[in-house]
Amino acid sequence: MAASTSAQNAMTSSPYSMFGLGEMASGLYGQNTSMAGVTVGMREGMLMNIENPAGLTALDSCKLFAEASAFVKNERYRSDGSSSNAFTGNFSAFSLGGRIMRRWYMSAGVTPYSFVGYYFKSSQELEGSPGTFVTSTFSGTGGLSKAFLSQGFLLTKHLSVGMNLNFIFGNMTQNEIQSAMTVSREMSGRSFYADFGLQYHRPIARETFLTVGAIYGYKQRISLKNTVTVTGSSTEPPYNQKRVTQYLPQYIGIGSSLAHKKWTYALDYLFRQYGVLNSGDSRVKFRDSHELRLGVCYFPNGFSSS
């Protein structure tokens, strides 16, 4: 089998985004991205840490923060001797945050949750007909977005907790063309869910601060309205609509950071239960992921750690 791919989406060009809910967004922006994605134990006076909302309690209480993010990435894929390159980029997130009351901090915004964006062709020889090939074309666009309301509470001088209230929504379109037949699948879904964070933070020496944190997000069911339209076939019904059940994966993370003067060092461990996702193809299975992240930051003017 031979295949070729090319980008048709500004958010991703990955053929893997045709499975499940698409290619999952990292959820990391700004300083978190530049430090290899560490978030669990991060808290700074100018950092809106929505991955661990307990970190919001470190925000400068005299300021209102606004953050907009964009990204660019270069991807290369190979399949049976052929390869493709894609350079993509787009606006990715927007958020606002600051202190509401003495011990209460809040942030709100919109970020991507998953991306669907692919276009490729596959040619396969017909059994019993040497030299005769059937070409199938696959394409997809769309994805899910996340609107969030994050809240952080400073329970004591050294202990903070936080919670993200999230609304997942979006549409995905997938098309498969083979000879004269076209199968179009349109999926739309929405779901509410919450995730939680905890941080213990204290100075351990002069100009040296230690933070230990944890985050947790539970497995959440999401119902997708799945509409399938078939054209060019006399044997299949032209239209079918049904509900498909999918899941937002459970995850748990622990991490810590050490801030000393202008330097910050951080380490995270994250477990994500991707095995609960349904790929939509019996040949494709998702596996749980384990991530270990290590980040170092040098800030010339220094952050006001707390």
Residue ranges, per PLM feature:
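Outer-membrane beta-barrel porins/channels
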Residues: Q8-S34, G81, S95-S306
